Amino acid sequence: MKRGWSPSRTATGGLFAAWAGLFWFLLLSGRWSLYVSTRTFWVVPTGAVLLSIAAAARLASARVPRPESLPTTTSWAIGVIALPVVLILALPPATLTSYALGRRAGFVGSGVNVSASDIASGQLSFIDVAAAQSNKEGMAALRARAGEQVTLEGFVWQEEGAAADEILLTRYVVTCCVADATSAQVRVVNIPPGRFEPDDWVSVTGRIYPLGSEILVDASNVHAIPQPSRPYLTP
């Protein structure tokens, strides 16, 4: 009996192949960092391999002895499931910006592997500073280092009514994926007025001073930088 291609099996096999291709693309291009954290990066290569196997298996069984139809509901379902693949590949890569700040919670330190002893010693990073703001022990450890020089990178956010030489240096912290992103901010003073626009990425060097629940950096050097390849922090 002559075997023919099943529209349903071919379509689902193509869907698996499309998603597998997307995962391979994210893996090889490095764009996975725009969607997941380093903690959950394993999902990308695992998904690429498993979906490739699923696509090959489904397409291998797509030739059937009897004609099979593709119901309209199934066609719509496949189209909807394939839509994210089309959007991610068609649209230019984008990260969360200051526009999302009002829609994101502040960093609370859940799931953070930064202890007070880590904050008390070594070079201070943005994630150390963010973690210090989430608990009393961390803030106490940071206060003990008041006046030390730090270098932090982030994007510019200007608070309404703030002084012209002042910005909030901002980073998003992603624990699992970009959907759970929270924001961490440090107030930076002594910035050249009007030199930087909101969402510009900058590197700030200066002395750090915890003041109450806020952290301030008195900048001695500020310069523009390209957006990092991994713009989100992972605690």
Question: Predicted segments — roles?
Answer:
Residues 1-235:
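OB-fold and OB-like single-stranded nucleic-acid-recognition modules
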